[in-house]
Amino acid sequence: MASRLPTAWSCEPVTFEDVTLGFTPEEWGLLDLKQKSLYREVMLENYRNLVSVEHQLSKPDVVSQLEEAEDFWPVERGIPQDTIPEYPELQLDPKLDPLPAESPLMNIEVVEVLTLNQEVAGPRNAQIQALYAEDGSLSADAPSEQVQQQGKHPGDPEAARQRFRQFRYKDMTGPREALDQLRELCHQWLQPKARSKEQILELLVLEQFLGALPVKLRTWVESQHPENCQEVVALVEGVTWMSEEEVLPAGQPAEGTTCCLEVTAQQEEKQEDAAICPVTVLPEEPVTFQDVAVDFSREEWGLLGPTQRTEYRDVMLETFGHLVSVGWETTLENKELAPNSDIPEEEPAPSLKVQESSRDCALSSTLEDTLQGGVQEVQDTVLKQMESAQEKDLPQKKHFDNRESQANSGALDTNQVSLQKIDNPESQANSGALDTNQVLLHKIPPRKRLRKRDSQVKSMKHNSRVKIHQKSCERQKAKEGNGCRKTFSRSTKQITFIRIHKGSQVCRCSECGKIFRNPRYFSVHKKIHTGERPYVCQDCGKGFVQSSSLTQHQRVHSGERPFECQECGRTFNDRSAISQHLRTHTGAKPYKCQDCGKAFRQSSHLIRHQRTHTGERPYACNKCGKAFTQSSHLIGHQRTHNRTKRKKKQPTS
């Protein structure tokens, strides 16, 4: 019988006969004792299911006989021999023994039968448990009967283990019954026919070890469902903190050891409290802002543009919001800045340190000068993190404090702005302008405790570096998304942000001494010295160092020109070619000579022009040694040598 819940009421009533299974004398004789016992249990369970949806019914006599009889066969009660109730046209074989008389249960009509297991479904659903409790006949049964029914239904090993732990001698009628019930529970839990002696021993050691743990720790470990002792040890070692109150005194026996026949009421209350209270695991050491911050040296900071510095500020503030959102009480310290300087004197990069505090975390006015931004970014970032955390598992929302005196004036105090939990969500609209001198982030209750500090630190460090570049691209697209083709192309070619932090390794080429901060670029550069060209064109056999170069070259054979100018309609097969072409329409000359101030549209033109100032002539003729500033000039010069050779080879007339 499949267990399911009703989705809609049936049109026809279901009688007890619809859910009853009958046997002939020959069939009944073929059943062994266990099968007959199972038949009796199924019939009794069907009766309980009928009663659960028809509470006014009383217990019929046949049910009592089923509960008492050890070898009951339903055909021994005698009913009319020739017909089956409700099917008079069907005749019975006269050689068969008569069927039992019509039971009062045959007249029971219910809407739909719910096949529910009281022992399994009841403890997990209060409404299902109430169905069994409302019937007086069921609630009058002795507790020992319930334990016996649990023992007769094997269930899964975990359920048997729970029943084994909850076994009480006082629920049994005598020592013999208690011993038999305990042996049956052990068989259901340990399953000696399916497990070896070593596996059974492992289960017993695991159970004893769990019983020796403190109550709260044991409750948390059991919730992780460990399968062996090694997993339990790993879980316990991962717990880095536990209060002294939860540690058992020396010499005191562990509570809740396996199969305790006598458990006091006080110990039971402690076990119930341990099941309700969540396990709080705190890190061994506080996470400081320095652990998750990305630092720059003075030279590295000078390489960053204004947009990248702005993104650095946003990501650092967002990382700080992460620390606050998980309940850390932190204090933000700053360093004095030199006049008209974007970075501190002692430490070039904006270094933000978070240390443990008992109440607040403060951002001084010099932080604003350092990061070149307003407190509004701090507000937006912290609120965003709090709202995202609330959507997952936080019951409350954090807002800014709204003081009535400040709301009436339309602006906040110029000394400080408080970030607190408030009940009025309209305070943000009334808060007015924000001053950037100081921000106080008040204590936020802990919401989530970190089990492993190292994994959290690595995750926050990685997210900080990645989001710097992602947010830069998003802001660029948001500002210039509706611009011309040139703007869109420039946005898609956003230069990757140079992710540098203290201790990072710089790649230096041993052949030419060139330095690379991106390992991918360095690997491409090494192929130039080795001559490796792994990407070969299938049409002409030409090799390339990068796959993108091969893709661009294949457009020469296919004639594909996917890049079209929106101004004149001219098409190009290379993205850089259309970028250079767009400058003819806009008149942009981004490459400027530092010596004479002359500007150029292409970087190659600037490099060629700078040779006029430096006197460099990198292209030398291998015939006569003459040098040139451009490769095209060298090619033209080499033709003069070829003409001279051809003239010498011509015969004289």
UniProtKB/Swiss-Prot annotation:
Record keywords, A-Z: Cytoplasm, DNA-binding, Metal-binding, Nucleus, Repeat, Repressor, Transcription, Transcription regulation, Zinc, Zinc-finger
Subcellular location: Cytoplasm; Nucleus, Nucleolus
Disulfide bond positions: none
Biased composition (Polar residues): 405-414
KRAB domain span: 14-85, 287-360
GO CC annotation, single: nucleolus
Family of the protein in this entry: Belongs to the krueppel C2H2-type zinc-finger protein family.
Self-association state and partner proteins as the record states: Interacts with SETDB1 and TRIM28/KAP1. Interacts with ATRX. Forms a complex with ATRX, SETDB1 and TRIM28.
Protein name as annotated: Neurotrophin receptor-interacting factor homolog
Organism: Homo sapiens
Organism placement in taxonomy: Eukaryota, Metazoa, Chordata, Craniata, Vertebrata
